[in-house]
Regions:
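Conserved phosphate-coupling serine/threonine residues in phosphotransfer and NTP-handling enzymes
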Residues: 21
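Asp-based, Mg2+/Mn2+-dependent phosphohydrolase catalytic module
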Residues: 5, 9, 16, 24-128
Length: 128
């Protein structure tokens, strides 16, 4: 995705970034290393499943205030909907290469929460 390193560099100077991905530990660790993006994150978490319980647990682990924590992702099923269910805000950045099993309707944000839908990852700089 264009402008990802520049956008992450911008965001990390203003916010604490935590990478959360799901899958097999060895496979995901390798992908993170090969991406060259690990340096932009203060922590990385590889989980078996990304659901609201996991987001609750991570918010506790990292002492995140849910009212000011955002999940940014391209999967309604694993990123956006469970984050909203866990009381977080969410930014949906659709991507054409998102695995078909991750597709589902994006839920509306519950009262008191926000949902942004962006066309490009670089647009995050306009909001954060």
């Amino acid at each position: 995705m264009p402008e990802v390193p520049q956008t992450l560099e911008y965001l990390r100077t203003r916010h604490r970034l935590i990478l959360v991905t799901k899958g097999a530990q060895a496979e995901q660790s390798g992908k993170i290393e090969r991406s060259g993006l690990k340096e932009y994150f203060s922590a990385t978490e590889i989980v078996a499943e990304k659901d609201s319980a996991v987001y609750h647990a991570l918010a506790e682990k990292y002492e995140l205030a849910r009212e000011s924590t955002w999940m940014i992702g391209n999967s309604p099923r694993s990123d956006i909907n469970p984050a909203l269910a866990a009381g977080l805000h969410a930014v949906f950045v659709p991507h054409g290469d998102t695995w078909i099993l991750e597709h589902e309707e994006v839920n509306a944000a519950p009262a008191g929460q926000r949902l942004l839908i962006l066309g490009r990852f670089a647009e995050l700089r306009e909001h954060f």
